[in-house]
Amino acid sequence: MACPGFLWALVISTCLEFSMAQTVTQSQPEMSVQEAETVTLSCTYDTSESDYYLFWYKQPPSRQMILVIRQEAYKQQNATENRFSVNFQKAAKSFSLKISDSQLGDAAMYFCAYRSAVNARLMFGDGTQLVVKPNIQNPDPAVYQLRDSKSSDKSVCLFTDFDSQTNVSQSKDSDVYITDKTVLDMRSMDFKSNSAVAWSNKSDFACANAFNNSIIPEDTFFPSPESSCDVKLVEKSFETDTNLNFQNLSVIGFRILLLKVAGFNLLMTLRLWSS
């Protein structure tokens, strides 16, 4: 009866030894890179085995785990996948990921993972957050203010067109809310822009003071309090032109008439051929 107990003890001991022997370490909690440049994410691991597999995964804001690249320990040649490549040093137990020509879509959390050849369980590192800074051409920083036409206590400030080196910080005023820096990528126009939004319900809220805790360029354009955008003016600018609508309807009607004439001629021709 002692044999089953011994076997269970052996299994538990083996599992504990495996969990203690295999570790994955990522020493870079966060890395940043300028768009189109190269960045390297480091990863080290500890194992007593000689046959195993290594992986790099990326986790975008959607939280989905996406396999980037894998490396078999028995292969001496480093794995490559388009712009992604690894530097695998088996003796040093190092497995770094190199990303060339960084794109905005590369921004994500990257996880290094280890898997034994005899165990399907993946062991992950803590992850490295990669931030890709857009390459802004000819930045022209400006702050615009929009007030609600129905309530003077509601105001929104848009800080836009600033370079990637500018950091946007939260306001010390608890009544002022500022979003994180976001990137507008208009690929059809080959144009990128950084932007951040601040808002408050305070009646004395002014855009000139909204970003006081952020280091912004000295040449940033600020509107005067009298020149803030009015919602009614914005809505009016999008009103349709009656004459333009009539012309569009006329063109559509003319095209329909031409199609009917062409269809009638085709029908008469077919009837003549059939007779």
From Swiss-Prot:
Database matches in InterPro entries: Ig-like_dom, Ig-like_dom_sf, Ig-like_fold, Ig_sub, Ig_V-set, TCR_alpha_C, TCR_complex_component
KW Membrane (keyword) present: yes
Q: Where in the cell is it found?
A: Cell membrane
Quote the entry's note on domains: The complementarity-determining region CDR1 confers specificity to the metabolite antigen.
**Subunit record text:** Disulfide-linked heterodimer with TRBV25-1*01J2S3*01C2*01 beta chain. The alpha-beta TR associates with the transmembrane signaling CD3 coreceptor proteins to form the TR-CD3 (TCR). The assembly of alpha-beta TR heterodimers with CD3 occurs in the endoplasmic reticulum where a single alpha-beta TR heterodimer associates with one CD3D-CD3E heterodimer, one CD3G-CD3E heterodimer and one CD247 homodimer forming a stable octameric structure. CD3D-CD3E and CD3G-CD3E heterodimers preferentially associate with TR alpha and TR beta chains (via TM domain), respectively.
Return the PANTHER family for the record: T CELL RECEPTOR ALPHA CHAIN MC.7.G5-RELATED, T-CELL RECEPTOR ALPHA CHAIN V REGION-RELATED
> What name does the UniProt record give this protein?
T cell receptor alpha chain MC.7.G5
Which species expresses this protein natively? Homo sapiens (Human)
Q: Which gene encodes it?
A: TRA
